Amino acid sequence: DADIAVWAPPVNAQN
């Protein structure tokens, strides 16, 4: 879900 990672920290982008 790279699209959601925009608002989430890159470190937890995989979550």
UniProtKB/Swiss-Prot annotation:
It comes from Thelephora ganbajun. Monomer. Optimum temperature is 45 degrees Celsius. Activity decreases sharply above 50 degrees Celsius and below 40 degrees Celsius. The keyword Hydrolase applies. GO terms for molecular function: RNA nuclease activity; tRNA-specific ribonuclease activity. Has ribonuclease activity towards yeast tRNA and polyuracil, and decreasing ribonuclease activity towards polyadenine, polycytosine and polyguanine respectively. Lacks antifungal activity against M.arachidicola and P.piricola. Inhibits HIV-1 reverse transcriptase. The keyword Manganese does not apply. Inhibits HIV-1 reverse transcriptase with an IC(50) of 300 nM. Optimum pH is 6-7. It is an enzyme of class 3 (hydrolase). This is Ribonuclease. Its EC number is 3.1.-.-. Keywords: Hydrolase, Nuclease.
